[in-house]
Amino acid sequence: MLSTRLALRSNIPMADFTTWRVGGPAQWLLEPASVDETLEALQWAQQEHLPCRVIGAGSNLLIHDDGLPGLTLSLRKLQGASLNAENGVVEALAGEPIPTLARRAARAGLNGLAWSVGIPGTVGGAAVMNAGAQGGCTADWLESVRVAPLVGGVSFELSRDELDFDYRHSRLQDEELVVLSARFRLEPGHDPEEITRITSGNLSHRTSTQPYTQPSCGSVFRNPEPLKAGRLIEGLGLKGNRVGGAEVSTLHANFIVNTGAATAADIDSLIQRVQQQVEAAHSLHLHPEVKRLGFTEAA
């Protein structure tokens, strides 16, 4: 039995929970607002023998038009953070929005998260993906995460060294672990006005060079370093290329936007078209940053 704190809902359109604004219904949905509620929800799914998927802000996420069986756990209400301006330690729950945390850190004179202000994700998602932008990344400042097994077990802590960080990757992508919270160690003692100015400048740069006002997942493909995915795609004249309501952004070619009536199938088809054309032209396979849920085949 679930406690009365958790409202179990059924047949909920996941388009309302993703930044692409696509996705079919979740069979069951829970939105825990605390660590205890999150652990309770995981335990309930196990007791009911339900497959369980955990999502954050719904960025970097493509959910199938047919939706998701079992339980979907949205952590977007699992918010909260404490910042110590003296020693730079920041403790944040998994659903805390990264832009919110970046702004709070700036106001506290803490340097380290200014690069992240335009990332439309959560602390948990940033840890899983090793999110990064403008020369910074999560691994640079993350000290540890508290996680729980998706199925059974108690929560435990993993240090930065145990997370096996790489470019847009961590071991959390390979194991069935749910991020509950994270600890960052930032640089204290900076001028809040200066850090705020830098943070605001980073956001202005992102909004002027990326389709910030249209539904998207952020960057679709990992950069095949030292090359840039967006430049490869743009070089093939694919800006503005469309499948249904999905379009390669005319502002930044590594973004696919929902022009208003896109389906997950439209977006998936456009991703594959871009991959095929880049591979044909450059013998390079572009690997998506996007996590696909409800799809059977690999991208």
UniProtKB/Swiss-Prot annotation:
It holds the Pfam family MurB_C. Pathway: Cell wall biogenesis; peptidoglycan biosynthesis. It catalyses: UDP-N-acetyl-alpha-D-muramate + NADP(+) = UDP-N-acetyl-3-O-(1-carboxyvinyl)-alpha-D-glucosamine + NADPH + H(+). Residues 21-189 form the FAD-binding PCMH-type domain. Gene3D superfamilies: 3.30.465.10, UDP-N-acetylenolpyruvoylglucosamine reductase, C-terminal domain, Uridine Diphospho-n-acetylenolpyruvylglucosamine Reductase, domain 2. Keywords: Cell cycle, Cell division, Cell shape, Cell wall biogenesis/degradation, Cytoplasm, FAD, Flavoprotein, NADP, Oxidoreductase, Peptidoglycan synthesis. Cell wall formation. Its EC number is 1.3.1.98. It comes from the Bacteria. Coiled coil: none annotated. Belongs to the MurB family. This is UDP-N-acetylenolpyruvoylglucosamine reductase. Its main location: cytoplasm. Its cofactor is FAD. GO terms for biological process: cell division; cell wall organization; peptidoglycan biosynthetic process; regulation of cell shape. One of its GO terms (molecular function) is FAD binding. InterPro entries: FAD-bd_PCMH, FAD-bd_PCMH-like_sf, FAD-bd_PCMH_sub1, FAD-bd_PCMH_sub2, MurB, MurB_C, MurB_C_sf, Oxid_FAD_bind_N. NCBIfam families: murB (TIGR00179), PRK13905.1 (NF010480).
